[in-house]
Amino acid sequence: MREATVYLLRIPGAGELPLSRRERERKAVESIIREVFGPEAALHHDDNGAPYLDGTATGTFISVSHSASTACVAVRNGSAVGVDIETGRSQLRSVAARFLSPDEQAIFTSDTALLTAWTSKEAAFKAASEPRLVISDIRLSSDMTSAATPSGQRFALFHHPIGDSSMITIAIPYA
């Protein structure tokens, strides 16, 4: 079964909550965690930076992402999940060679395709949780419905556009 639950929360602007952007993002994620798992749940990060929760059932996996305006937490029971949310920006075109293989660069040329490829690789990277994995080594299928790591892990990818310029991608391991 390939199920995950994704929670979104708008991040307050600096005028609404006078903290640094990073602090507003952190507070938004903590708010989601408290709402979903209760006040006893505590978010931590392992040595590789992957998030995990104390105070929840064993086997609960989470992934965290945020854009400038939205915090996102994906939750899955039983196996890993990866999530990424991004707002499209022109910089993706200038850094495409850093995250796409030459073959992928030839296929994914539009701004929307670059945004989808970026979020796909980020989500798969998070779900893989492999030490020393390099994002450019993750390979995407030409239709961006799956991703694979050099070690053989494979992921189903699910894309959800948000508004005109943002994308959420969820990566779930194939059984």
Where are these regions (language model features)?
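Core catalytic alpha/beta fold that binds nucleotide/phospho-ligands
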Residues: 1-175
